[in-house]
């Protein structure tokens, strides 16, 4: 699985074994956080998880 991992859409990472979801969320409605995860993060505004390549755009 390949996910975006920075605020820039041209930078991606290959997820490690066991992390089968891409995610993004906003902290304080300003900062965008992206990456790979095993479970969807909770407790953040506008959290989105998905399971296809580069789906956390």
From Swiss-Prot:
Cysteine-cysteine disulfides: 3-22, 15-36, 40-49, 50-55
Tissues in which the protein is found: Expressed by the venom gland.
Gene3D superfamilies: CD59
Record keyword Disulfide bond present: yes
Subcellular location: Secreted
Record has Transmembrane helix as a keyword: no
MF annotations from Gene Ontology: sodium channel regulator activity; toxin activity
Annotated Pfam families: Toxin_cobra-type
Coiled coil: none
Alphabetically ordered keywords of this record: Disulfide bond, Ion channel impairing toxin, Neurotoxin, Secreted, Toxin, Voltage-gated sodium channel impairing toxin
A GO cellular component annotation in the UniProt record: extracellular region
Function description: This toxin shifts the voltage-dependence of Nav1.4/SCN4A activation to more hyperpolarised potentials, inhibits inactivation, and produces large ramp currents, consistent with its profound effects on contractile force in an isolated skeletal muscle preparation. This toxin produces large muscle contractions and fasciculations in the indirectly stimulated chick biventer cervicis nerve-muscle assay, which are significantly inhibited by the addition of the sodium channel antagonist tetrodotoxin.
Similarity comment text for this entry: Belongs to the three-finger toxin family. Short-chain subfamily.
Name of the featured protein: Delta-elapitoxin-Cb1a
């Amino acid at each position: 699985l390949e996910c975006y991992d920075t605020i820039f859409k041209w930078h991606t990472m290959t997820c490690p074994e066991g992390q089968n979801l891409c995610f993004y969320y906003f902290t304080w409605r300003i900062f965008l956080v992206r990456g790979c995860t095993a479970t969807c993060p909770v407790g953040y505004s506008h959290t989105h998880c998905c399971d296809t390549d580069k789906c956390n755009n």
